Amino acid sequence: NASDSNNFLAVEDNSISTSARAIQAITISAGGLTALNVPIILEEQDELKWQTDVSDQHINLHYVQLDAGVRQRYRGICKQLTTADSADSFITCPAGSTIIVNFVQFCNQSGGTASNNSFTITDSSASSTKIIDKGAVANNGIAGFNRTFVLESGDSLNFTPDEQPFNVYASFLEIRNPPIRGQ
């Protein structure tokens, strides 16, 4: 392109809302390229959207279509958090399952810098909550985590935004625990 472009990558998670939520803001310089390595999982009726302020953008998307499993399935959640200074458990592992989270990203859409955000994990069996990270996120900025979090039944990942709205996206594998024989 002959000019810089401002772009948003968004996910519409139809199990939660019919509105698309930005999960990444990107500026691409004139004539430049960008590559996003974001593991996005779309479930039935979900949509991936790209918004740009410059026409005639070329986008390449690589994907894999997975069958829905009986005992395990890949899931994704995209949610808008609209209450500042209040913890939101955006993923809670259901009873009889284990969840392996491989990616979490928070996108600040508040219009200003959110300076005191907190990302935590709650271990329900120990009744304890531990801080994973805390700090500031600029407007249209992101805080992303490409690391594994394992949640057992009742455990949760939580985010407390300093400003609102914040969009959260997470991809994970949900494994249904098999019944134990002989009990």
Where are these regions (language model features)?
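A short, sequence-level motif marking secondary-structure junctions
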Residues: 27-30, 64-67, 135-139, 174-176
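Tandem-repeat/low-complexity and Cys-motif detector
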Residues: 1, 27-28, 51-52, 94
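Beta-strand-rich interaction surfaces with strong enrichment in secreted/lumenal proteins
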Residues: 22-26, 37-39, 79, 132-135, ...
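Short, surface-exposed beta-strand/strand-loop-strand elements in extracellular ectodomains
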Residues: 3-25, 111-133
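Coil residues (strongly favoring Ser/Thr
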Residues: 5, 86-89, 124, 156
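C-terminal interaction-tip segments
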Residues: 43-44, 52-99, 103, 107-109, ...
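Beta-sandwich interaction modules
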Residues: 29-45, 139-154
